Amino acid sequence: MAKTLTERFYQPKELKVMGRWSVEDVTVNDPSLRPYINLEARLLPHSHGRHAKKAFGKANVHIVERLINKVMRSGATSHKAGGHFMRRDDRSLMSKKMKAYEVVKEAFMIIERRTKQNPIQVLVRAIENSAPREDTTTIAFGGIRYHMAVDVSPLRRLDIALKNIALGASAKCYRNKTSYAQALAEEIIAAANADPKTFAYSRKEEIERIAQSSR
């Protein structure tokens, strides 16, 4: 008797991200971020850009893929200007998603080895600790410009956290023997533990402190 199409192909009982890590037990404690952190069971976190032209489409992109996309940006130096890292003309990961995928996968393996925890859960904790709740905007009134504290939308909170995690890792491995994967793993672990020495967490504290002084 001929096998059906379904029987011919292997179907795993549970899809694991990158074939290694389950998302079933991963929890998000922050209620505002919960709807925007996509934790679908997906073997390969790659959406082929299908959400790029949709309003708020990136909310449907898997959280691991969003980290990979941030890793593909130009790197940061160890120098700052106005509180921000200066960028370098480094194209080693720009537009190279498979290479960025391997970097993130290696970083997750380092996190799992050091913490004995699911690295996706550690990443979620790092995002929650690095996402600023308040920021400042410039208001013009009567020809005078001044700063005003505003609440940050959940989607932007997520963007800022992921961007600063990737930037902090890039700056940490600038001109030294530390690999990007190792630096990324250290940045995620430190941010998950709310370590003030890490760039992502310290930047969040700085943004909220400036916003509080602008109330």
Swiss-Prot record:
Record-linked Gene3D superfamilies: Ribosomal protein S7 domain
Coiled coil: none
Pfam families: Ribosomal_S7
GO BP term, example: translation
One cellular component term from this protein's GO annotations in UniProt: small ribosomal subunit
GO MF term set: rRNA binding; structural constituent of ribosome
Signal peptide: none
InterPro entries: Ribosomal_uS7, Ribosomal_uS7_arc, Ribosomal_uS7_dom, Ribosomal_uS7_dom_sf, Ribosomal_uS7_euk/arc
Highest taxon above the source species: Archaea
Keywords: Ribonucleoprotein, Ribosomal protein, RNA-binding, rRNA-binding
Family: Belongs to the universal ribosomal protein uS7 family.
PANTHER family: RIBOSOMAL PROTEIN S7 (PTHR11205)
Functional summary from the UniProt entry: One of the primary rRNA binding proteins, it binds directly to 16S rRNA where it nucleates assembly of the head domain of the 30S subunit. Is located at the subunit interface close to the decoding center.
Oligomer and partners: Part of the 30S ribosomal subunit.
Stored NCBIfam families: PRK04027.1 (NF003106), uS7_euk_arch (TIGR01028)
Protein name: Small ribosomal subunit protein uS7
Native source species: Thermococcus celer
Gene: rps7
